[in-house]
């Protein structure tokens, strides 16, 4: 089979890399992405490995790159993508990259520091000028000359009125949210021996750190006494106020203001030069950072891979072990040969035997990746196990569409996915960072098929936004029924519900060419008809899907050489499943084919027949579908029950018998091996895990000696119980196809009846259809997308996911493997 139907053959290779060419060879392998290295130094600490110094140097460079990246983002610039694919640089270039990076980082730190210092000085000058410009007039309190006011202190200052009557001033600026608290604290701490004036700046000033505009409150405080002045200075320091000297004379203030404006202009010129130099430094950073990040990341990845290698006894080469696809072995040999020849040495790679299970490698493209992701989300398949993904490409969208069948809804989903497919090569679409969008974009081909299959099942259900469409003429004739029955006006007035009898000549003209006849949308028993149809269809699809899963297990047994499981597991499982539930499908189809409208009144009940089948009984009122039906049903039940002990005991007894036979044969085999020379032995398998003995599920000597019959029997008992009970529960689980399909149809009907039908009625009555239908259609469109497409679509998706993971894959798929994760630079280049 191809690699999509089964994972590729993977071999364990041993690489001998000369020390001089080890870096070049591993770098080349990273560009190709062919091998997954095994850690041969698992017991060695990360700090004791050979290339730990180089890894630390790369990590220090990454920290510097992070600092430069933050500075670029702080400046509002965008890093350009690196041009082309950059190889991992030679080790000697690491020192050059480090020197250039450190020099740029230091220049940025110096320029940023100077810029912040200049901005802080400019901010101080602007605040000082704003304080002088605010026009605070020195208010000499009349507390000592005039009458008392409400702020006149009740007690005199310590020392009496003759202590110090000179008035001093403190001017400054404070943040607005601190001004009320500052004013209250000053008044209480100084006991009222001050006069404070607060005013808000008319224009905000740029904050020196954040660069955002900030408002400030200027203040002027008049006080008496040195002790009060000390208190005021301490309080303003606690509130981080900007305090400036205040000049009482108007001429002196104007002169100081002119001097401050001149200093501000000079500082702005210096700051402009600093910012221009900063732009030049950032331009050099934009040139160095994108390629430098890619190169250092690749270099670090190479050294981490080299740390997984062991050193030869002569210390002249590194020894590595890696998993590689057999298909890629020639490319691996060529890459090692070309890389090592550049250094004048030769690297060697050869396959070695291994008892460990190899990793799973399944190559995908942009179409199959989303379907393979659905399978891998449940569990990565074992090595060379049958891959469910090729079949999931068809079955998953189809089962989704069975629950989501509607032509209109499927068409909207198809167009949305088609738009993503057509725009998949646009850089803006790929670079979108929205996580929800990325989820939809990665599954665009899955959505495309889901929409396409929903259109198909929508035509079968004959539903388009819950409305039936008449593509072909109906197979029922109302006129023929009216002519034959003689319906009069009085009869029609008395009977609101009329019955079309298919036994009347000319009433039923034949089946509808495709899908359900649109006349069923007018019938009172429309829901009952759809219930019966979808329920039986769900059971049929479920049994076929599960039987297909059991059949796929045959390919696993044949490939791994476990042919005894064909008779002891697969055959009993198919007999049990088809003997019971396959027979139920047969009854449904047989009744469809053999029970016509003329015999509909006496049609037997399949449900009663199926129940009587297990009870070994018969209902006289429920006639048989075919002769000797009871004998056939009893035989099938007995045959299905007989498969249970075979399924339970067959495989354990076979393994135990084979185990004992090998134990008896082992001494003779060892004597023959001792007599035979080493060169006389047959060729061993290169990959020990994939040898014939391993494929047959055989065990090595240690495992054979430890084989416990109770564990084997317990494992098989769990498998038997799970399968037998699962046949019942899984068949019932497929009824969710019927339930969700019915729910989707009814929800669509309710949305149409409660929104669009009301809107159409209002438009006809009021005569303003164009005005009324615009908001109503907008509401209908929004609710259709939000409820029927997103919510109902997600629900159907999750149920289809469960049907594949539990009901289908557990019949043949273990999912206990692990992916081949090749050493590659692809993510770094992207």
UniProtKB/Swiss-Prot annotation:
Job description of the protein: Subunit of the V0 complex of vacuolar(H+)-ATPase (V-ATPase), a multisubunit enzyme composed of a peripheral complex (V1) that hydrolyzes ATP and a membrane integral complex (V0) that translocates protons. V-ATPase is responsible for acidifying and maintaining the pH of intracellular compartments and in some cell types, is targeted to the plasma membrane, where it is responsible for acidifying the extracellular environment. Seems to be directly involved in T-cell activation.
Primary location group: membrane
Species in which this protein is naturally found: Homo sapiens (Human)
Residue intervals annotated with topology Vacuolar: 405-406, 469-532, 592-635, 746-766
InterPro entries with a match to the protein in the record: V-ATPase_116kDa_su, V-type_ATPase_116kDa_su_euka
Tissue: Isoform long is highly expressed in osteoclastomas. Isoform short is highly expressed in thymus.
Family: Belongs to the V-ATPase 116 kDa subunit family.
Subunit architecture: V-ATPase is a heteromultimeric enzyme made up of two complexes: the ATP-hydrolytic V1 complex and the proton translocation V0 complex. The V1 complex consists of three catalytic AB heterodimers that form a heterohexamer, three peripheral stalks each consisting of EG heterodimers, one central rotor including subunits D and F, and the regulatory subunits C and H. The proton translocation complex V0 consists of the proton transport subunit a, a ring of proteolipid subunits c9c'', rotary subunit d, subunits e and f, and the accessory subunits ATP6AP1/Ac45 and ATP6AP2/PRR.
The name this protein goes by in its record: V-type proton ATPase 116 kDa subunit a 3
């Amino acid at each position: 089979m191809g690699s999509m139907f089964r994972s590729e053959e993977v071999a364990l290779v041993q690489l001998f890399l000369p020390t001089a060419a080890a870096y070049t060879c591993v770098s080349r392998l990273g560009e190709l992405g062919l091998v997954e290295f095994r850690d041969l130094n698992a017991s060695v600490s990360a700090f004791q490995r050979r290339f730990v110094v180089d890894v630390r140097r790369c990590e220090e460079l990454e920290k510097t790159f992070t600092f430069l990246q933050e500075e670029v983002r702080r400046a509002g610039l965008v890093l350009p993508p690196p041009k082309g694919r950059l190889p991992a640089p030679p080790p000697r270039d690491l020192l050059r990259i480090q020197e250039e990076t450190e020099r740029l980082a230091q220049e940025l730190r110096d320029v940023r520091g100077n810029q912040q210092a200049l901005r802080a000085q400019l901010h101080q000058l602007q605040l000082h000028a704003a304080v002088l410009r605010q026009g605070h007039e020195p208010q000499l309190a009349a507390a000592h000359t005039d009458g008392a006011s409400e702020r006149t202190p009740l007690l005199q200052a310590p020392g009496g009125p003759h202590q110090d009557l000179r008035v001093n001033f403190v001017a400054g600026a404070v943040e607005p949210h601190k001004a009320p608290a500052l004013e209250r604290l000053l008044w209480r701490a100084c006991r009222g021996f001050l006069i404070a004036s607060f005013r808000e700046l008319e224009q905000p000033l740029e904050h020196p750190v954040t660069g955002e505009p900030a408002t400030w409150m200027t203040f002027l405080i008049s006080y008496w006494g040195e002790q009060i002045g000390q208190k005021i200075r301490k309080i303003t320091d606690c509130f981080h106020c900007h305090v400036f000297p205040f000049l009482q004379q108007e001429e002196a203030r104007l002169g100081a203001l002119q001097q401050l404006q001149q200093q501000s202009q000079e500082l702005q010129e210096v700051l402009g030069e600093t910012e221009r130099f900063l732009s030049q430094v950032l331009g050099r950073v934009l040139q160095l950072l994108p390629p430098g990040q890619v190169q250092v990341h690749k270099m670090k990845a190479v050294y981490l891979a080299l740390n997984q290698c062991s050193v030869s006894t002569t210390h002249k080469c590194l020894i590595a072990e890696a998993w590689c696809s057999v298909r890629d072995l020639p490319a691996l040999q060529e890459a090692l040969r070309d890389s090592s020849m550049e250094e004048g040495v030769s690297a060697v790679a050869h396959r070695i035997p291994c008892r460990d299970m190899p990793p799973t490698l399944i190559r995908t493209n942009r179409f199959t990746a989303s379907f393979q992701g659905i399978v891998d989300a449940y569990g990565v398949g074992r090595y060379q196990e049958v891959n469910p993904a090729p079949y999931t490409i068809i079955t998953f969208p189809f089962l989704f569409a069975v629950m989501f069948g509607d032509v209109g809804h499927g068409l909207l989903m198809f167009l949305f996915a088609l738009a993503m497919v057509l725009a998949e090569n646009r850089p803006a679409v790929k670079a979108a960072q929205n996580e929800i969008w990325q989820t939809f974009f990665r599954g665009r081909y899955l959505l495309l098929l889901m929409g396409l299959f929903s259109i198909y099942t929508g035509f079968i259900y004959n539903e388009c936004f819950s409305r039936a469409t008449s593509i072909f003429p109906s197979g029922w004739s109302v006129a023929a029924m009216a002519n034959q029955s003689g319906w009069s006006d009085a009869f029609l007035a008395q009977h609101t519900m009329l019955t079309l009898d298919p036994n009347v000549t000319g009433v039923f003209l034949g089946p509808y060419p495709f899908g359900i006849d649109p006349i069923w949308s007018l019938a009172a028993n429309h829901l009952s008809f759809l219930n019966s149809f979808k329920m039986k269809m769900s059971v049929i699809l479920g049994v076929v899907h599960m039987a297909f899963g059991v059949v796929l297990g045959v390919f696993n047994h044949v490939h791994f050489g476990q042919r005894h499981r064909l008779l002891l597991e697969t055959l009993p499982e198919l007999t049990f499943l088809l003997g019971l539930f396959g027979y139920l499908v047969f009854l449904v189809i047989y009744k469809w084919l053999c029970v016509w409208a003329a015999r509909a009144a006496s049609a037997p009940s399949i449900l009663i027949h199926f129940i009587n089948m297990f009870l070994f009984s018969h209902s006289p009122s429920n006639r048989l579908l075919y002769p000797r039906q009871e004998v056939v049903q009893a035989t099938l039940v007995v045959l299905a029950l007989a498969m249970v002990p075979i399924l339970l005991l067959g495989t354990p007894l076979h393994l135990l018998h084979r185990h004992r036979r090998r134990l008896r044969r082992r001494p003779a085999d060892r004597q023959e091996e001792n007599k035979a020379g080493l060169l006389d032995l047959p060729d061993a398998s290169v990959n020990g895990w994939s040898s014939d003995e391993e494929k047959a599920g055989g065990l090595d000597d240690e495992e054979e000696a430890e084989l416990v019959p109770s564990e084997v029997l317990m494992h098989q008992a769990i498998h038997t119980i799970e399968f037998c009970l699962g046949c019942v529960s899984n068949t019932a689980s497929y009824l969710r196809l019927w339930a969700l399909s019915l729910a989707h149809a009814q929800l669509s009907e309710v949305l149409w009846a409660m929104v669009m039908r009301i809107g159409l009625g209002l438009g006809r009555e009021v005569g303003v259809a164009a005005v009324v239908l615009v908001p109503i259609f907008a509401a209908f469109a929004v609710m259709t997308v939000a409820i029927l497409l997103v919510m109902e679509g997600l629900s159907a998706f999750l149920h289809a996911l469960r049907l594949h993971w539990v009901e289908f894959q557990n019949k043949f798929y273990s999912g206990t493997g692990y992916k081949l994760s090749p050493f590659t630079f692809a993510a770094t280049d992207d």
